[in-house]
Amino acid sequence: GRSFQMVNLRHASSLVEIRERIQKAVVSRGPSQWIIGRGWNHYQWAEQREPTRKDLDDIIPNNPAMMVRACGHSIWVNTAALERAGVTSRTPNPAGGQIDKDPDSGEPTGLLREAQDIIEAHIPSPTLEDRKQMVLAAQEDALRSGITGVHTCESLKEWEAFAALEAEGKLKVRVYHLLPPDDL
């Protein structure tokens, strides 16, 4: 269900198209709310270049933004997100990760590779009500496709959303929910 709240960046043929999709999403968000997207792949773009924070800053000046690459191993963020996370030219690369920096100024470009945790730690966790809405959106999509049962392996917090919806009589699909070992 979380993916229904993200900006879909898949199959875009240009950075211009990506920016248009992001701009549409900004309209429905309040000031300072995070804008999160997933699926960009610069190899599919006409521009054939990696994006930078500047490509987001002019269209999202007031909201922190994080766009996850199609592979899931890199993120593209704007200046507001870097500021929220305290990432500067002096921030060292995390173990096993990299914060891309401009070779001339040393400032972060807005690309982080294998270093998503630096930014994600500053994104507020969804409330129980948020998680319930995510489940309901996913359930509606599944039912539209004729799917009446699902398997999921998510945290105890996600299970709480399923349990609450079941207690409210709103869960219409059968759910086989696995918990990660850390939640046992």
Locate each region found by the language model.
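Divalent metal-binding segments
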Residues: G1-L184
